[in-house]
Amino acid sequence: MKKKVLRITTVPVSLDLLLKGQLKMLNEMYEVVAVSSPGKELEEVGKREGVRTVAVRMERRISPIQDLKSLFALVRLIRKEKPWMVHTLTPKAGLLGMLAAWICRVPVRMHMFTGLVFPTSTGLKRKLLMATDRLTCACATFINPEGEGVKNDLMRFGITRKELHIVGNGNINGIDMSYFDRTEEVMRKAENIREKGCVTFCFVGRIVGDKGMNELARAFKQLEADFPACRLLLVGDFEEKLDPVLPETKRMLLENSRITFAGWQNDIRPYLAASDVFVFPSYREGFPNVVLQAGAMGLPCIVTDINGCNEIICHGVNGLIIPSHDESALLKAMKFMLTDEHARMEMAGKSRELIGSRYERSFLWNEIRKTYQSLE
């Protein structure tokens, strides 16, 4: 009989996008049950991955009453399912899932830490976030930071004294290099997006403050004033509730004719293929998939010196690393990429090979399998 594993995320889109294919792979060796908040994505995950799904409502934000309800629901579920392992991803699922698994004395309790919020928070919020992360670690038997930066922060801030395990070279699910490639179909679609005769900078993600969008808007305004033959392609949507951009930033982005909005896209490959440089001035990450994807598509990247980004990008090799929150450094890096075509093309030529050699999906999946087997 296969051992049972509960994989828990706060919202189903995390199962759908971050763990694509992984649940199906693990289900060949274990009985995998996917648990998350209700939603059409949860149903889609069940069909695509061939796993059973269970809906348990969880809130991403701090919500004491709902959090207690979610905890009790998870305890009931775990007592019913009697899993060998509970493996959580995302902060709230980690806190509630690890606590419920500890209450039920599940033998293996694994949590993966991705982007940490507390290092960039202040005051009471920071103390509360650190306390919840400490509780998550206290309940877990196996703690898996997504990368070296996350591992260092967990140690530096004294979140836990337990051993921390990075699987492979880091990342949640690795990258499918055969999918993120400049195929004929992708390049045909890219031709309809590309603007000839200019250098296109591309950003993919939520258009919010902590992705560095305020700095990017101001830097591009200055860049475009000096070098009209440039373009900014934004693939993502504004968010009005969680960390919206400044009103003047939104106005700047919407009114500039050299900025193109593509909105949210299920397939970002044509947009990356139609671009020359990927720019990602985020304040905090765990191990950003989008930087891996841009690199796999052969783009040099401008990233900030934060967790994950500074592991994926080697400065001057496959991109440039700049300080976060630094508009002038961002402008300087964008100017360099725009004016030095030789350096830009040289970095582009090394991007795909570097990403594939360290983060190819089949390699990471094999490391995940070995990790699970070592815990049996």
What is each residue range found by the language model?
Residues 264, 283:
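Aromatic "clamp/platform" in nucleotide-sugar-dependent glycosyltransferases that forms part
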Residues 43-47, 231-258, 262, 343:
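Short, structured helix-loop element that forms part of the nucleotide-activated donor/catalytic region
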Residues 88-94:
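Short His-centered aromatic/hydrophobic patch
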Residues 54-55, 134-186:
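Donor nucleotide-sugar binding/catalytic pocket of nucleotide-sugar-dependent glycosyltransferases
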Residues 291, 300-303, 313:
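Short hydrophobic beta-strand element within catalytic cores of glycosyltransferases
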Residues 329, 336, 343-358, 364-370:
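A short, well-ordered alpha-helix in the C-terminal region of glycosyltransferases
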